[in-house]
Amino acid sequence: MNQYYFLSSFLSPQQPESPPLYLFQEINDLLSLNFTEQDWKSYVVLLRFFDLENFAFFWSGKPVPFSFGTVTNNNVETLLRLQMWSDEWEFEDFFKDFLLRYKTSQERLANFSELVRSFLDHYQSYPSEFLRTYFRFKQDLRIILAGFRARVMQKDVSFVLRDEDSSNPVVLHVLMQKDSPNYELPDEFFELKDVLGDYGRLPHMLNQTLSLYEFHKVEEMSRDKYFNADAILSRVTTYLMAIRNSYVSVQKGKELINLMEKGIKW
């Protein structure tokens, strides 16, 4: 409890669109000294998620634009060959199955959305409440964006979402919009309506606006959390977003939208 009180008091709130308050190494050092073993594992899972898109860059033949240390230009081939995140942690079963099912870089890139979905689903049973909430948000956001793109590109949304969990209320909601003249969002995503209307056809602008939207949603996730690991992880997530945004160019932002936020098989 004392370490959480210290961290909550020490770590200042990150402002959206402001320079990062802390260097990545400073965050690592602080958490390594104050987190429990389980807290640290949750933090590492969060870093893996932020770096997951780097596999897609690798499979597309492009250099990794930025890394939080788990998937880098230097280690990505070794990770895939050994199927291990580190000396202690193997790839999850869903990741191994993905690599077994899709042999070539082209196949893996084409089906990257499946890997993203499997990652987010897998950690829905993880002990960290924040990670469960954040990953559910990211999963549902993928579906919302896929439904919107299907409408813009005049594709059959039921085909676009064919591999998604049909018991997910957000999936059902989007499928019900198939013949609707307007794209109505679930209540928990109502703030996105104007965003999609204004920026939905401009990938680089949508990336920036979605990042700001996600930032505020992450803040909401810890609004009723005090002096525990979930509150710290929520704040750390805003730092990671600020650090990544400070490095990613507009062009890379377009690629991130295509590789990560789209995240749906067409």
Swiss-Prot record:
InterPro entries cross-referenced by the UniProt entry: DUF2764
Family, as annotated: Belongs to the chlamydial CPn_0087/CT3_09/TC_0583 family.
Protein name as catalogued: Uncharacterized protein TC_0583
Native organism: Chlamydia muridarum (strain MoPn / Nigg)
Lineage, broadest ranks: Bacteria, Pseudomonadati, Chlamydiota, Chlamydiia, Chlamydiales
